[in-house]
């Protein structure tokens, strides 16, 4: 696995696979930032703007959906996906 980007742009929808994906590897920092923001009680619109690079005032539905799916994926990574990382990463 190569080092993930520190502030990558995101897709409109996070993966929903039952295994770690290349996208997940590329967005590890994004996932950790989302989990940190949730733990800190940050407002979702601020997180969408800063972490996901989507303006929730201009694109509210897109921003909310991207936020929800990426946060769900971040939680999946913390609970399950990390095991795939320990085994060597995404299946190529």
Predicted region positions:
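Short, amphipathic alpha-helical "recognition" segments used to contact nucleic acids or chromatin
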Residues: 24-40
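A detector for short, charged/polar N-terminal pre-domain segments
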Residues: 18-24
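Major-groove recognition helix of helix-turn-helix-like DNA-binding domains
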Residues: 33-34, 57-80
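Basic, low-complexity segments
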Residues: 1-18, 91
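Short, charged amphipathic recognition helices of the HTH superfamily
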Residues: 40-50
């Amino acid at each position: 696995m190569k080092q993930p980007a520190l502030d990558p742009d995101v897709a409109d929808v996070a993966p929903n696979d039952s295994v770690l994906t290349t996208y997940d590897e590329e967005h590890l920092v994004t996932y950790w930032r989302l989990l940190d923001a949730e733990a800190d009680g940050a407002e979702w619109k601020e997180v969408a703007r800063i972490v996901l690079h989507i303006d929730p005032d201009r694109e509210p539905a897109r921003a909310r959906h991207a936020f929800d799916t990426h946060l769900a994926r971040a939680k999946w990574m913390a609970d399950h996906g990390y095991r795939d990382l320990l085994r060597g990463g995404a299946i190529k």
